[in-house]
Regions:
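Short, charge-rich binding segments
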Residues: 74-79, 85-87
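Domain-length cofactor-binding catalytic modules of enzymes
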Residues: 15-44, 51-58, 64-70, 79-82, ...
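Short capping/connector residues at structural and topological boundaries
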Residues: 75, 94, 378-379
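A generic, well-ordered mixed alpha/beta core segment in the N-terminal half of proteins
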Residues: 84-138
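Glycine-rich loop at the start of a catalytic domain that most often binds anionic cofactors/ligands
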Residues: 69-77, 99-100
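Short, positively charged and aromatic/hydrophobic N-terminal segments
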Residues: 2-15
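Acidic active-site catalytic centers that drive phospho-/nucleotidyl reactions
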Residues: 60-61, 88
Length: 442
C-alpha cells in the first residue's frame, strides 16, 4: 500500500511546491506547513547582523529547534554561530546498497548489533575495542582527530571520547535494512559525532557568549599589558596590574540571546577548524558501523561481492555541517546536480533515494527528512503503544517500545507532503522501505 501511494505521487505532475516568504528579507520557506515558533526563530535569525544580506532558504521539513530553526540553509559569512550547526556536528546517513542472498535472521542481526555496536549513551568497553581490529587505522584516525582539536584542553573525559568510535547514539539515530521495489537491499546507518560534537559546539558557543560580553577584548588588553610590562622589566608588578585590569572590567550586554551569539576573527577560524574535524569523525563513525554490519551479513552468506564493488555504490548525506561550498546546512543536505542523496521519511515509510538537481534557488540543498510535527514530550504524553505497534506491522524491530515512541511514524510530517515539495530540489530515483529497524532505547 505504501509503495502504491508513492507511485501515485511520483507519477502526478500537478503538484507545485508550496512556499512562504518573509518581508524585507531574502528568505524562502519551501512549505506552508510551518508552526509559528519556527517562523519566529527565522525572523529572529534574520534580525541579527550575521545573516543580513544573506540568501536564506528553509527546507520543506522545517520545524522549531533549540534556539535555531531546523531546515536552515544560508551562506557562511565573517561571523559564525556555533549553535546554528548545532551539537551533533556532521550527523548524517550512510547508505550501502547490496544484493541479498538468502533469508536474513533478523533476531540474530539484532543480537549482533546489541553485542557489537554500542548505542544510546553507551561506548565501547576494552573488549569492544577488540572488535574494531579490522578497522584500527580508522579508529586511530578518529583518536588523532580528537587530539588535533584546538579546543582539546577544554574537552571532558577524553578517554571516553576515544571509545565512542563505531557507536550509534540515541534519539532519531538508527540502523535499518531497507528494500526497494526491485528487491534490492540497503544498509542504512544514521548517526553523527556523538558527545564529541556536543562538547565542541558547547565550548565554542560559550566562547561566543563570553566574547560578546567583551571577554576577548579583555584578553587582548591583558596580552598587551604582559608584553609591555615584560619589555619594561616590570615583571614583579605584573600580577597586581592584571588583577586591577580584571577588577575594572565591566561586561557588556550582548545584543542577541546567548544561543545566537557569534564568533569572528581567530575564534571563528578555530571553530571552523574543529567543526571540520568533527565532521570527519562522524564520517568515520558511520563507516565503521556500516562495515561491521556488512561483514556480519557477509559471514552469514547474505552479501556477496567484493569490498571494492560495494564501496563504489556507497554514499552518504550529511545534514548538520558547513560544506566546502560555504553553505551552512542545519537539518538540510547537499543536493548538487547529479549528487546522490537520501531523504528519510520515518521508521515505517522508509527513505527516498534521490539525485540532486543543483538548484541555486534552494542553496543547492534538499530537506534532510520529513520534519517533526510533534515534540518528544508531546509524543510521550499523547501516543499509545497500540498505535505505535500497529504503525510498524510488517517491519522487524525489537526496539518498538515506550522508550522509542517519540520516534514513531506519527510524529513526522506525511511522506507525501515532502515528496510533493522537493520537485525543484531533487529527482526521486526510488523509495526504500524498512524490513528491519534498530533504535536505542534510552
Amino acid at each position: 500500500m505504501i509503495f502504491h501511494m508513492y507511485a501515485v505521487i511520483l507519477q502526478t505532475t500537478y503538484f507545485q511546491a508550496d512556499m512562504r516568504t518573509i518581508d524585507n528579507y531574502d528568505v524562502k520557506i519551501f512549505t506552508d506547513n510551518i508552526e509559528e515558533k519556527a517562523i519566529e526563530q527565522i525572523r529572529r535569525l534574520m534580525s541579527i547582523d550575521v545573516f543580513s544580506g544573506c540568501k536564506i532558504r528553509i527546507m520543506t521539513d522545517v520545524h522549531a529547534g533549540a534556539g535555531c530553526v531546523i531546515g536552515f540553509t544560508g551562506n557562511l559569512g565573517d561571523r559564525v554561530i556555533p549553535n546554528i550547526v548545532g551539537v551533533d556536528i556532521g550527523c548524517g546517513m550512510l547508505v550501502q546498497p547490496f544484493e541479498c542472498s538468502g533469508d536474513i535472521d533478523f533476531h540474530e542481526l539484532n543480537q549482533f548489533i546489541l553485542s557489537s555496536i554500542p548505542s544510546g549513551r553507551d561506548i565501547r568497553s576494552q573488549e569492544g575495542l577488540i572488535q574494531l581490529q579490522p578497522y584500527m587505522e580508522r579508529y586511530q584516525e578518529a583518536k588523532e582527530l580528537v587530539k588535533e582539536l584546538r579546543c582539546f584542553r577544554e574537552l571532558k573525559d577524553v578517554k571516553r571520547l576515544y571509545k565512542a568510535a563505531g557507536t550509534l547514539g540515541g534519539g532519531n539515530h538508527f540502523i535499518e535494512l531497507d528494500r526497494d521495489g526491485q528487491g534490492r537491499m540497503y544498509v542504512v546507518v544514521h548517526t553523527g559525532s556523538r558527545n564529541l560534537g556536543k562538547q565542541v559546539a558547547d565550548i565554542y558557543q560559550k566562547q561566543a557568549v563570553k566574547n560578546m560580553f567583551g571577554w576577548d577584548k579583555l584578553m587582548e588588553k591583558q596580552a598587551g599589558m604582559i608584553e609591555e610590562y615584560k619589555a619594561a622589566g616590570r615583571k614583579a608588578e605584573l600580577q597586581e596590574a592584571i588583577r586591577e585590569l580584571h577588577n575594572s572590567f565591566r561586561m557588556q550586554r550582548p545584543p542577541v540571546p546567548a544561543e545566537l551569539c557569534w564568533l569572528e576573527g581567530q575564534p571563528r577560524e578555530d571553530y571552523l577548524h574543529d567543526m571540520r574535524l568533527c565532521q570527519r569523525w562522524a564520517q568515520i563513525n558511520r563507516s565503521i558501523i556500516t562495515d561491521l554490519l556488512v561483514e556480519y551479513l557477509r559471514a552469514k552468506g547474505n552479501i556477496s561481492g567484493t569490498q571494492e564493488a560495494l564501496a563504489r555504490e556507497r554514499f552518504e548525506s550529511v545534514h548538520n555541517y558547513i560544506g566546502d561550498d560555504s553553505i551552512i546546512r542545519k537539518g538540510a543536505i547537499s543536493a548538487r546536480e547529479g549528487e546522490k542523496c537520501i531523504i528519510p521519511m520515518n521508521m515505517r515509510d522508509g527513505s527516498l533515494i534521490c539525485t540532486g538537481k543543483g538548484n541555486p534557488d534552494w542553496n543547492w540543498s534538499a530537506p534532510h527528512g520529513a520534519g517533526r510535527i510533534m515534540s518528544r514530550a508531546q509524543a510521550f504524553q499523547q501516543l499509545s503503544m497500540e498505535a505505535f505497534n500497529d504503525s510498524m506491522k510488517g517491519i522487524y524491530s525489537e526496539t518498538v517500545s515506550e522508550q522509542t515512541i517519540d520516534e514513531s511514524p506519527m510524529v513526522y510530517k506525511p511522506a507525501e507532503e515532502i515528496i510533493a515539495n522537493i520537485r525543484d530540489s531533487a529527482d526521486i530515483s526510488c523509495v526504500i522501505r524498512p524490513v528491519f529497524n534498530f533504535k536505542a532505547a534510552q
